[in-house]
Structure formats: C-alpha cells, structure tokens
A protein has these predicted regions:
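Short acidic, glycine/serine/threonine-rich loops at helix termini
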Residues: 20-22, 56-61, 122-128, 200-201
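N-terminal glycine-/serine-/threonine-rich phosphate-binding loop
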Residues: 1-48, 57-67, 76, 181-186
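Short, basic, glycine/proline-bearing loop/turn elements
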Residues: 16-22, 159-166, 200-201
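Short, ordered loop/turn segments at secondary-structure junctions
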Residues: 13-15, 51-53, 60, 115-117, ...
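Ligand-binding beta-strand-loop-alpha-helix segment within the catalytic cores
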Residues: 65-189
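Conserved mixed alpha/beta catalytic, RNA-binding, or beta-rich assembly cores of soluble enzyme
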Residues: 16, 173, 188-201
Length: 201
C-alpha cells in the first residue's frame, strides 16, 4: 500500500442504487463520479454495497419460476445474494472504469469479489429476521405474502411492508486474503455486497 494514500471503505446503500435496472444504471454513474473524485484526491478506495431491493427482486423472480415449473427447485437466498453481488458489481465496475478512463486514469483496474462471510450457526438473528429485502407492499399484500409464501413481513419506516430475512453478525470475511491482495496491488475492489453471503463451518 502506498503510504501517501489514505485507505477508505465506501459503503453504498442498496436503496440508493435504485429499484430497477435503469435506475441502477443511472445511480452508479453518479456514484462513480464521487468515488473517482476521492481517488484523484489521493485516496485508496474499497467499495461495499447493500442489496436489499435487488436481492428481493431476484428472490421473487426465482421463486416465481419455481412455482411455475415443478422441475425447477427453489433457489436458496444465499445464491440470490451471490447473484445480486455479481450484477451490482458489474454495473459499478463498468461505471467506475468508464469514469476513470474519462479522466485519463488507465492504471487502476476495477474488480468485483463475490464475498462470503462466516457466521455463527447459533446466532439469535436467525430466529429474529430483521433485514428488509424486496419492494414495498401494502398491508393487504403483505398478509397475502405471509399466508401464501410463508414470508415474514414487517412495516418499514412507515413506507409500507417488506419481507425481512435473518441478518447474522459476520465473524470473518472468507475472501479477505484475496481482497487484500487485490487492494495492495492497486486495484479498486468492490466487495462484501449485501454484507456478504453468510456461511457456516
């Protein structure tokens, strides 16, 4: 690591990335400008991001496919988190690379790391889901989702109801060594999307 550079982690909220693909494409371009501003000021940046709306949409789509096709097994939420890391990372890294090139910065590679985090299988968070995912619903829609799909729904800041899932405390980043290697080599890394994919030993 260049000692002259200040290493910082930027955490982007999933809601700030928009609720649709076009919204996300627009949001990441704005975000990329702010991040590259920091790089030009001499900062070494690592990007993390939320995924609440995105992972919910992916999960809903995969669940709908499973309901329509008896031969299509249900997709675990962990796989949906991995999908969200990949597609958010894809948009972010392309926007960042474009912004870097627009400023004639060609020596900073951008990479997305699919990231897992080790959690305790006995974490009480598994029994008290609290992380909102997916889109907002009315109270009536939320009741249908609970009855029909077994989702746990909660009101979210007076804006409507959303599905909530467990959010266990991360104990260790599984890919931390790989992330360090990339950052130390001068790459702009996007990692730990959605807090990481929770795994147990």
């Amino acid at each position: 690591m260049d000692k002259k550079k200040k290493r910082i982690v930027i955490a982007l909220g999933g809601n700030a990335l928009g609720n649709t693909l076009p919204e996300q494409m627009k949001a990441v371009k704005i975000t990329a400008k702010a991040i590259v501003d920091l790089i030009e000021e001499g900062c070494e940046v690592i990007v993390a991001h939320g995924n609440g709306p995105q992972v919910g949409m992916i999960n809903n789509a995969m669940a709908a496919l499973s309901r329509e096709d008896a031969n299509q097994p249900n997709t675990p939420l962990s796989v949906c988190v991995a999908m969200s890391q990949a597609y958010i990372g894809y948009d972010l890294q392309n926007a960042l690379r474009e912004e870097l090139y627009n400023r004639n910065i060609y020596d900073i590679p951008v990479a997305t790391m699919i990231t897992q985090v080790r959690v305790d299988a006995d974490d009480p968070a598994f029994d008290a889901p609290s992380k909102p995912i997916g889109h907002f619903m009315t109270e009536e829609q939320a009741k249908i989702a609970e009855e029909k799909y077994g989702y746990i729904m909660k009101e979210d800041a007076g804006r409507g109801y959303r599905r909530v899932v467990a959010s266990p405390k991360p104990a260790e980043i599984v890919e931390i060594g790989a992330i360090r290697s990339l950052v130390d080599s001068g790459q702009l890394v996007i990692a730990c999307g959605g807090g990481g994919i929770p795994v147990t030993r």
